[in-house]
Amino acid sequence: MANIMDYMDWRGDLSFEADEFNEVDNLILAQLAYVDFEGIVTAEENAPAVPLKEASGQFWEKNDKDEILARVSMTKSAPFVMEKMAETKRFSDVKLRCYVNEIRDEEQFQFSAVCVELPDDGLYVAFRGTDNTITGWREDFNMGYLSETPGQLRAVEYLNRAVTDKKQRVRVGGHSKGGNFAVYASVKCDPQIQNQILNVYSNDGPGFRSDMVESTEYQRMLPKLHTILPESSIVGMLLEHQESFEVVKSSNSGIQQHDA
């Protein structure tokens, strides 16, 4: 069954001008949030964006492929997705900026995100899902009973700060908990930015408590919210959803379907 690497073989030679942005592009860009850009892409929102080719080259100068492959992680493929992206016409000209990666054990807080400047002058804001830290998993559990988590609040702050061009078209997305953050940030961000947002993508991300999905602000953004789920989704079926969703086939089974 074809995957995102096959998609880049198939459509990687087409620019966004030739073939407009689609849901698979969203999933590919969401993977960039799992790459460690520490020392490569600065957190400063007004700093020059870093070309993907350059960021990929610097990453692989600092990291060993065999060591990454040996990790016990569902997200270890992300750097290889980035490497493939840098080789394609479709993604090689994207630029990265505003990378943050924060973990605060005492607050049970794990947050990471990166902005992707697209060749069509659009912006994709990618939020990272749960990492391998205990803190990250604790925050996941907190979502079940807290009306808002520190990570969700940080996502709102990040989105408000990262969108510096008030005329730019914006897409927001993430995988797993990153999808939840993408939706939460889009629902709670400044009205000006909400007007700029074209679509919000939750790639197998959990939903929210009923008070959130029934709120006026959530309902206002509902037409722009899109959830993408594998056939036997587990994470994406947690808590409540009201947005439209699309089910995709997966060659994996059980929780392994959560792997993008």
Q: How would you name each of these model-derived features?
A:
Residues 1-24, 29-114, 119-123, 127-142, ...:
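Alpha/beta hydrolase fold serine-hydrolase catalytic domain that processes acyl esters and thioesters
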Residues 173-178, 182:
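Gly/Ala-rich beta-loop-alpha elbow adjacent to hydrolase catalytic centers
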Residues 182-191:
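Short glycine-enriched nucleophile-adjacent loop
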